[in-house]
Amino acid sequence: MPRELTEIKEFLLTARRKDAKSVKIKKNPENTKFKVRCSRFLYTLVITDREKAEKLKQSLPPGLQVKEVK
C-alpha cells in the first residue's frame, strides 16, 4: 500500500528503519520521486528542487539498495 511523505526528515527516518529494503529514484523533467519499500507500505516523497534531490540522494543510508529509474 502506498503512503506519501511530505517532509525530508520524515523520509530519512523511514529509510533508516530496519524493515526498509530498497529505494527507487524516478526523475521527471519537473520533479524527482523517492520511493522507499518497507515491509508494509511503499513510502513516496516528491521533490521539485533538483539540488535538494541530489543532497537527499547523497544522504541515503549506505546499506540500502538504490535503483534509478528514468
Curated annotation (Swiss-Prot):
Transmembrane region(s): none
First and last residue of the signal peptide: none
Q: Which domain of life is it from?
A: Eukaryota
Alphabetical GO CC annotations of the entry are:
cytosolic large ribosomal subunit
Could you provide one GO biological process annotation from this protein's UniProt record? translation
Q: What are the alphabetically sorted keywords of the record?
A: Ribonucleoprotein, Ribosomal protein
Pfam families listed in its UniProt record: Ribosomal_L38e (PF01781)
Gene3D superfamilies linked to this entry: 3.30.720.90
One GO MF term on file is: structural constituent of ribosome
Assigned protein family = Belongs to the eukaryotic ribosomal protein eL38 family.
**What is this protein's name?**
Large ribosomal subunit protein eL38
Record organism: Timarcha balearica
